[in-house]
């Protein structure tokens, strides 16, 4: 059994000295620490996010679940067609969204998500638990029945 993680490795840290590693971390603390934690917990098969061909992972019968972090920044009227593409490519296997987060500068829980985004989240919720970031996101998504 294996887990697939949709992610593009952008930097190989091992080739840089410590000062440069801290520089990278400071520019993207949350995502870098977050991805490292997912790697340590699941030891996933890394799947290129933007350059995925069907033969990259469709035939991986050992992958039972897929993980995405692409929904950490949900904004009004935004759609996520690349996440739909992930769902299409993995068939009926679960795509687990880690740290789903609604973003509103006014912190308004009555935020209006694009209908396609609501449909996407409902489709994902049929296969996996939606891991949301905090009470604000839970309340905002609850307004859409999620």
Where are these regions (language model features)?
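Aromatic- and Gly/Pro-rich donor/ligand-binding loops
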Residues: 1-129, 135-146
